[in-house]
Amino acid sequence: MNLSEELDSIYKEAIQKIGSSISEEDLDKNKNDFIGKKGKLTAVLKNVASLSIEEKKTVGQKANELSKKLETFISETKTSLKKKLFEKQAASEFFDVLRPLSKPSNGSLHPITQIQYEIEDIFASMGFSVMDGPEIETDTNNFGALNFTEDHPAREMQDTFYLENGNLLRTHTSAIQVRTLRKLKPPFRIIAPGRVFRYEEVDASHEHTFYQIEGMVVGKDISAANLIDTMQVLLSRIFEKEIKTRLRPGYFPFVEPGFELDISCLVCDGKGCPVCKQSGWLELLPCGLIHPNVLSHAGLDPKEWTGFAFGLGLDRLVMMRYGIHDIRYFQSGNLRFLKQF
């Protein structure tokens, strides 16, 4: 039997074997047996080297034709097997179109949204209005009008997400403070909840995207005593118990004097943990009396008007309330975590 006859014999055998395949796995095995690297057709072609030039041309051309025919037949057989499998499944399966649908599970508000609404209600009871502002801000509203100097570290690329047009993702809800000072005439009391962004290394207590509530009161004869009293009312109503706090000096360009309001870590009861960085205290609320330059920039006379401002971190507040040890859970989208609230 010469090579041409051997090719015909292999082709007939391949058609018979491939055509009798009962599954895609069986088809793949038969395919490899004939046109795989170690297949029968491949083995025959290795003997072509011993033929004359004319015979090489004839046998090579025939081998290519048979190989293409087999590829086409394999493809058709695969389609046929898939169709038979689908028909078998369709015949064996039954779907009752009259069966009542399963009741969809109820959704719920994100824990941060829940506490935001609760805080809004608390401040509404104290005469505060709720304001809003864009997440994409100008450099002026986010920094300049808040008394940040041109060389302030917060303006640098490693701390702030800048856009190509020079705008930025707001780094604090204090930017809404600027818009409010231009929009409203004092006296007024406002809070401004929203999402903020900072280019930070993410860990158990830091996220690049988080939530704040900015608060601001502008009027006459506003003092630090008014600020402290407001914060005490807020914390006692949020946690429904006395919370150990401490007020320490802090520097923020838009307030003078500035304070840091810390609360005893409720995750570890002040003993030290990754959330409070083993200190037992958690920075919750930077605050202070509004800087005269901020009032002047808004067209208000700081000799006539005074006020206080604060920025409350909602993520950390929720962590303290529920004893959550990692801020990253809030942005994870993990339903097992979120369904607990």
Swiss-Prot record:
User: Principal localization?
Assistant: cytoplasm
The Swiss-Prot or TrEMBL record annotates one GO molecular function as: phenylalanine-tRNA ligase activity
Task: Give the first-level EC class, as a single word.
Answer: ligase
Among Pfam families, the record links this protein to: Phe_tRNA-synt_N, tRNA-synt_2d
Q: What does the note accompanying the cofactor annotation read?
A: Binds 2 magnesium ions per tetramer.
Catalytic activity, reaction form: tRNA(Phe) + L-phenylalanine + ATP = L-phenylalanyl-tRNA(Phe) + AMP + diphosphate + H(+)
The answer to whether keyword Endoplasmic reticulum applies is no
User: In its keyword annotation, does this UniProt entry include Ligase?
Assistant: yes
Q: What is its EC number?
A: 6.1.1.20
Gene Ontology process terms (BP) = phenylalanyl-tRNA aminoacylation
Which cofactor does the UniProt annotation name?
A: Mg(2+)
Where is it found, in Gene Ontology cellular component terms?
cytoplasm
Compartments, record wording: Cytoplasm
Q: Which InterPro entries match?
A: aa-tRNA-synth_II, aa-tRNA-synth_II/BPL/LPL, Phe-tRNA-synth_IIc_asu, Phe-tRNA_ligase_II_N, Phe_tRNA_ligase_alpha1_bac, Phenylalanyl-tRNA_Synthase, tRNA-bd_arm
> Where along this sequence does the record place binding of Mg(2+)?
E256
The record's keywords, sorted A to Z, are: Aminoacyl-tRNA synthetase, ATP-binding, Cytoplasm, Ligase, Magnesium, Metal-binding, Nucleotide-binding, Protein biosynthesis
Q: Which HAMAP family match?
A: Phe_tRNA_synth_alpha1
Q: Which family does it belong to?
A: Belongs to the class-II aminoacyl-tRNA synthetase family. Phe-tRNA synthetase alpha subunit type 1 subfamily.
Quaternary structure?
Tetramer of two alpha and two beta subunits.
User: What is the protein's name according to its record?
Assistant: Phenylalanine--tRNA ligase alpha subunit
Q: Which organism is it from?
A: Leptospira interrogans serogroup Icterohaemorrhagiae serovar Lai (strain 56601)
Q: Corresponding gene? A: pheS
